[in-house]
């Protein structure tokens, strides 16, 4: 049973005479007037039909309607930890919905002194039948990256109402932070157009140059395979790690070059010719330092971004390579992607950081490694992962960690079509991706 009681003074339960009943009526009137003027907490409800509840009275946070903090001129629904590290509760309302309708949920919030907003602040949608019985899995709309200029975050996602559903219970939750406060505003669940499939065609190449005389010879070999991939109209092609070094007599330092530089120019001309994006592993020289770098080339042939490998094996350190210091995501015309390189896949933090930043596909130029790690990174972050390698498998992995298609020595180019708008539902869990960062261990437990 959920606790949905306010913080107002409550009258005695019974009286045995007329005067007592009269006094009770006066007391009730006084309390109601007091609550209306001083606080909206008394019944946990206000004019827009929002209520408040907590799993247990003992863990209920402070909750109130705040007219001093507004969203587009309207009062906000506030929740505060009030010194309780274990505080947990939510505003809620139930609304009628039509089966098969497409509805877009949106709620906005502004938070202060909240340690982990993704974990402590979220919305949940519970589907119900006509009697109010829960149907299927709850939904956890995504918190969009970034904030508005005035500091508001947005929770937003589009849903199709399941066929047997007639009601939706919407919850706006704050939990597990003693010192924080959140204000919710502008919450809506409105009819929308059905989403179009968001199709991306992803290519990976499996090729290891041997007895190559130069970096340029390597590039020519890879360019022939890119041309072969282009026949299948991919949106993006993934190439392997250190592609200008492998098979030559060069070392990390002698194979390094500026980025942008001659290789990005060479690859850019190809990308522009075939109207595709390209991910490629190179060795970058920047002043006195050399990095193991993956570049992203856009359809116009421009350098759209680069990632310097953060997790270096000792062998690369001994060879004079310097580690990078950040994980970045990049927006393309089909979605948001992240880049990792080889040894990064050994450590969960790399892929987890990219997923937390909104990456939908992670590209992995890799010399060689354990395929189980690639599968794990895809599963635990609910992303697609694309590897291009010499000594592991070059493949596209889905959100279950399954190989959708593999490139081999005999068939070095594969192209896979992915719908980034397709929801993956897991037995007993539902949409795991939407739950991951709501239920992830807190940083203070890890550190």
Model-predicted regions and their roles:
Residues 41-198:
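Extracellular and organelle-lumenal recognition/adhesion modules and their flexible linkers in secreted
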Residues 197-212:
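Short beta-strand segments enriched in small/hydrophobic residues
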Residues 25-37:
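Bacterial N-terminal signal peptides
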Residues 259-278, 345-420:
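CN hydrolase (nitrilase-like) catalytic-core segments centered on the catalytic cysteine
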Residues 150-158, 329, 388-447:
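C-terminal beta-strand edge segments of enzyme domains
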Residues 216-220, 225-299, 352, 368-373, ...:
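Cys-nucleophile CN-hydrolase/nitrilase-fold catalytic domain and related Cys-dependent amidase chemistry
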Residues 285-357, 372, 376, 380, ...:
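Active-site catalytic loop in hydrolytic enzyme cores
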Residues 8-28:
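Bacterial N-terminal signal peptides that target proteins for export
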């Amino acid at each position: 049973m959920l606790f949905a009681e306010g913080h107002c003074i409550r009258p005695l339960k019974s009286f045995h005479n007329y005067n007592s009943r009269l006094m009770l009526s006066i007391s009730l009137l006084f309390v109601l007037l007091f609550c209306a003027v001083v606080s909206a907490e008394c019944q946990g409800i206000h004019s827009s039909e929002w209520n408040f509840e907590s799993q247990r009275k003992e863990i209920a946070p402070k909750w109130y309607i705040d007219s001093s903090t507004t969203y587009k001129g309207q009062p906000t629904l506030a929740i505060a930890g009030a010194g309780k590290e274990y505080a947990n509760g939510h505003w809620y309302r139930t609304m009628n919905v039509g089966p098969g309708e497409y509805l877009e949920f949106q709620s906005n919030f502004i938070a202060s002194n909240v340690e982990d907003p993704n974990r402590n602040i979220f919305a949940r949608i519970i589907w119900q039948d006509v009697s109010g019985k829960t149907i299927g899995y709850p939904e956890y709309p995504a918190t969009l990256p970034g904030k508005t200029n005035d500091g508001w975050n947005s929770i937003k996602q589009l849903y199709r109402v399941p066929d047997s559903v007639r009601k939706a219970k919407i919850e706006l939750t704050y939990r597990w932070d003693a010192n924080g406060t959140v204000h919710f505003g502008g919450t809506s669940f409105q009819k929308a157009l059905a989403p179009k499939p968001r199709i991306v065609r992803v290519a990976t190449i499996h090729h290891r140059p041997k007895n190559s005389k130069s970096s340029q010879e390597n590039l020519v070999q890879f360019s022939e395979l890119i041309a072969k991939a282009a026949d299948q109209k991919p949106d993006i092609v993934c190439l392997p790690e250190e592609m200008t070094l492998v098979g030559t007599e060069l070392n990390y330092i002698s194979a390094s070059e500026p980025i942008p530089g001659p290789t990005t120019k060479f690859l850019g001309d190809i990308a522009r010719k075939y109207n595709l994006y390209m991910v490629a592993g190179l060795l970058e020289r920047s002043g006195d330092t050399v990095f193991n770098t993956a570049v992203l080339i856009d359809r116009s042939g421009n350098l759209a971004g680069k990632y310097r490998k953060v997790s270096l094996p000792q062998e690369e350190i001994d060879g004079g390579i310097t580690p990078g210091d950040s994980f970045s995501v990049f927006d393309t015309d089909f979605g948001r992607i992240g880049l990792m390189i080889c040894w990064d896949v050994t450590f969960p933090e790399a892929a987890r950081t990219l997923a937390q930043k909104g990456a939908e596909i992670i590209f992995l130029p890799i010399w060689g490694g354990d395929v189980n790690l690639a599968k794990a990174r895809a599963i635990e972050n609910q992303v697609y992962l694309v590897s291009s390698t010499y000594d592991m498998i070059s493949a596209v992995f889905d959100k279950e960690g399954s190989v959708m298609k593999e490139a081999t020595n005999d068939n070095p180019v594969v192209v896979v079509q992915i719908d980034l708008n397709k929801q993956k539902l897991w037995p007993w869990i539902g949409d795991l991706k939407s739950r991951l960062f709501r239920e992830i261990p807190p940083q203070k437990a890890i550190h």
